[in-house]
Each structure stands twice: as C-alpha cells, then as structure tokens.
C-alpha cells in the first residue's frame, strides 16, 4: 500500500491524498488553495486510472479541483453525502462564474462541473459499501452540515480513518462529530491540524464579545460588515444575530443566500433548523443589484449589518461594501473565520492593507477578529487521537507550526506520528 500526499501537506488548502494498492486507487478529497492565485493539488497523469474519489465535504479547499478530473475526460465515481453533493454544485458553479467575471483562468468550465456532479453518488452516513479490496463508510464529521469522516477497511488488514475537517463540540448549526468508528481497531489515522497548537476560546464568551461590538458599532451609527464563508459561517452568524435579537436591519448578500435556503431542505443535518428558518425570515435578502443599491442607501443613512461572502475577502460582494464603507471609522469589519496564508484577509491582518482589484488600500475602519471556528481545537484533536489510538498518525491540513506542534505532542504521548511534505509518498 502507498499513500501519496498531493495537497494539504504542511498547509491549509488543496486537500488531496491518494491511496494505492495492487488492486485499487482512490483519492481522498480534491480541493484548491484559494488566495491571490488559486493553487491546485499535484494531479499528474498517474491519477488517470483512479477508481473512486471521496469528498469529505463541500468547502472548495476539499472539492474545488474535482472538475479538473472531468476536464481530462476521466470517468470516475465520486462519493460524498447528498447535502455535500448539492453544496458542491453551488460552490463550483460560483467558482467558474467568478473566474469568468474576473477574467481569471481556471482549468475547467461549466460542462466539467456538470460532469463532476453527474458522476457524484450520494452515500448516507453509517452505510458500509464494498469495492475491490476495501470497504468504505462515512461518519458525520461535525465540521459543517453534510461533512464526513471516511473509514476505509482494506483486505490487507489495514484500516484507515481520514477525519477530513472535524469538530467534536456542537455549534449552533452542526452537531459534533460521530466517533463511533473508534469501537474498531484503526491502524492509520489521517487527521487535520488547522488548530494543532491552540484551544478555541469559550464559544459563549466569543458570541457575547461579538454582539457587544455590533451594538457598539450600531450605537455610533456605523455599519458592521461581516464577511462569511457561504457554507456554515453565514448560517452560524445568522443564528447568533437572531438569538440576541439585534434591533437593526441585517442584510444577507452573496452566495450565502442560496446556500442557506438549500441547507433548510436538509433539516435533519442541522442542529437548530427551526431557528435558522426564523433567522432567514428576519433578514433582508439581497437578490439583485437594485436590492444592493437600496441597501447601501439605507446603510449610509442609518447604519446596520451586512452578512456576505467571501469569508477571506478574496472576492464576492464584501469587497463592494468595503470599497464604500471602509473610509469611515464609525464602521467596522468583523472577521469571523480562518484567514489562510496568502488570502486577502490574512494580508489585511498582517499589513493593515487590503487589495480591492489591483489596488492595495489601507482601510480606515475598525477591524476585529472572532473565533467561530468549525474546526477541532487542539484539545479536541488530542481527544480524537487518544480515542482512535492508531499505529500510525498522519498529520496534514495545517500550516507547518500547527502540524509540527501536534506531531510533537503525539510523539511525546507514544504515538508514531509524521507530517508528510507535499508530493511525499509513504509505503505501509
């Protein structure tokens, strides 16, 4: 057996791992790394005979390179949950649309997206299937609705658990991960390490701090701009704003609108579905340019809240709103998600400047950060590792510092742990 790390090795983004035996070849995820330039996994000609692709969840860093396979005329089934399939379709179509609008080249088109979705076979959680020399089963990963950890049981008596992105604790939107796979012996655990060196602050305390800041902005007549990931963070923020009964107009813009409506068709996968329905009814939805113009008029006069994409400021309506509102210190930008290295959001944090188009600008509004992560914190990662108790621990999907700290902890606790480099191959 050989495991090849085609992406997300000592980095966050472009998740893609190949597992190859004498009888089968699969990919675990096929994502992109978003930033000023889009980076792709190593997808050379050796992947042409892949038997199956498993997608852990819809986020583009796990699904965004999937159409590349179909652009190359590959005929390969894709396995994921039904909700992930629907979300992936929305996100991939949007990626093509943005590329066309911004005149950026990406290595696939709308036809390739359609082919990727046509080849996608939905699979329920806890429904074991068999193929060639292995069985496979999906377990709820607790990261976002529809996310899955993937259990692979090979005939050579090697069992592999790929966590994907995972979270043990409940959030308002999603219930924590199902770890029932720990009842079986697992030889190899492939685990994320986004927060391999830090414990998340108390969620309730973060919410209260966030709400207090919004009230402060509204009291001074300002606009609170809240950039969000369309999948998960947008809905989590809507649930929080709804729960605290914020008395101000809340505008929901960008792809978050379509995604929220889609999620409400899968209420069994949501933690607070009735509250999300209520939250959506209480916001002003921006569906066309006239809505946006009217919203900007009202915001300029009276202040208010804008919840919109993109969460890392690399595109989407947030840049339009920033261009208009970033020169007034009464206004504020409230970052609610992880800012990947080389993203516009990370650039703002590190330099105090932001790119809008080709212009690098120093905004004159307040910038705040809040940890509403849907990833496991360091303590949760430790808990998973201890419960699984693998013979080999493979740490990926984390920047070098985070991955290395998690590896060192694992080594100190008696685990055989590695942090593979991009392109590295290991034999089992």
Curated annotation (Swiss-Prot):
Name the positions where Zn(2+) 1 binds: 57, 59, 143, 165
One of the Pfam families matching this protein, by short name:
Beta-Casp
* Cofactor entry: Zn(2+)
Membrane-crossing ranges are: none
Which keywords does the record carry?
A: Hydrolase, Metal-binding, Nuclease, Zinc
What Gene3D superfamilies does the annotation carry?
3.40.50.10890, Ribonuclease Z/Hydroxyacylglutathione hydrolase-like (3.60.15.10)
What SUPFAM superfamilies does UniProt report for this protein, alphabetically? Metallo-hydrolase/oxidoreductase
Which GO terms of the molecular function aspect are on file? metal ion binding; RNA endonuclease activity
Q: What's the Enzyme Commission number for this chain?
A: 3.1.-.-
Which residues are Zn(2+) 2-binding? 61-62, 165, 397
- Please state what class of enzyme this protein is: hydrolase
Q: Report the domain of life of the source organism.
A: Archaea
Family per record: Belongs to the metallo-beta-lactamase superfamily. RNA-metabolizing metallo-beta-lactamase-like family.
What the entry lists under PANTHER family is as follows: CLEAVAGE AND POLYADENYLATION SPECIFICITY FACTOR FAMILY MEMBER, INTEGRATOR COMPLEX SUBUNIT 11
Q: What biological function has been recorded for the protein in this entry?
A: Probably an RNase.
Q: What is this protein called?
A: Probable RNase MJ4
Q: Which organism is it from?
A: Methanocaldococcus jannaschii (strain ATCC 43067 / DSM 2661 / JAL-1 / JCM 10045 / NBRC 100440)
Ranked from the top, the taxonomy reads: Archaea, Methanobacteriati, Methanobacteriota, Methanomada group, Methanococci
């Amino acid at each position: 057996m050989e495991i090849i790390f085609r992406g997300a090795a000592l980095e966050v983004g472009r998740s893609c791992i190949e597992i190859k035996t004498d009888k089968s070849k699969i990919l675990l995820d096929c994502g992109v790394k978003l930033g000023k330039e889009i980076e792709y996994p190593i997808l050379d000609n050796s992947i042409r005979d892949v038997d199956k692709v498993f997608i852990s969840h819809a986020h583009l860093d796990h699904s965004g390179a999937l159409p590349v396979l179909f652009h190359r005329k590959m005929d390969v089934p894709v396995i994921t949950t039904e909700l992930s399939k629907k979300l992936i379709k929305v996100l991939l179509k949007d990626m093509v649309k943005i590329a066309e609008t911004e005149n950026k080249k990406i290595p696939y088109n709308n036809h390739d997206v359609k082919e990727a979705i046509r080849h996608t076979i939905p699979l329920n959680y806890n429904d074991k299937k068999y193929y060639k020399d292995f069985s496979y089963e999906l377990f709820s990963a607790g990261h976002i609705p529809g996310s899955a950890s993937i259990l692979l049981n090979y005939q050579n008596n090697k069992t592999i658990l790929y966590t994907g992105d995972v979270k043990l604790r409940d959030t308002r939107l999603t219930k924590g991960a199902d770890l029932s796979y720990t009842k079986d012996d697992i030889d190899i655990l492939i685990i994320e390490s986004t927060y391999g060196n830090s414990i998340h602050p108390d969620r309730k305390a973060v919410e209260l701090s966030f709400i207090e800041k919004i009230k402060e902005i509204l009291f001074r007549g300002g606009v609170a701009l809240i950039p969000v990931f369309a999948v998960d963070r947008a809905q989590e923020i809507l649930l929080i704003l709804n729960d605290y009964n914020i008395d101000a107009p809340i505008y929901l813009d960008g792809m978050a609108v379509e995604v929220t409506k889609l999620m409400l068709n899968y209420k069994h996968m949501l933690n607070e579905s009735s509250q999300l329905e209520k939250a959506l009814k209480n916001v002003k939805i921006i569906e066309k340019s006239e809505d946006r113009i009217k919203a900007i008029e009202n915001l300029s006069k009276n202040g208010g809240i804008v919840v919109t994409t993109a969460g890392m400021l690399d595109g989407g309506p947030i840049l339009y709103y920033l261009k208009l509102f970033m020169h007034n210190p009464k206004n504020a930008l409230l970052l609610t998600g992880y800012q990947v290295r080389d993203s516009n959001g990370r650039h703002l944090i590190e330099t105090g400047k932001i790119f809008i188009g080709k212009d690098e600008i120093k905004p004159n509004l307040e910038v705040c950060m809040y940890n509403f992560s849907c990833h496991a914190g360091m303590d949760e990662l430790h808990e998973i590792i201890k419960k699984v108790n693998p013979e080999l621990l493979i740490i990926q999907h984390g920047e070098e510092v985070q991955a290395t700290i998690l590896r060192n902890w694992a080594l100190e606790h008696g685990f055989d742990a590695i942090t593979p480099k991009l392109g590295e191959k290991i034999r089992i």
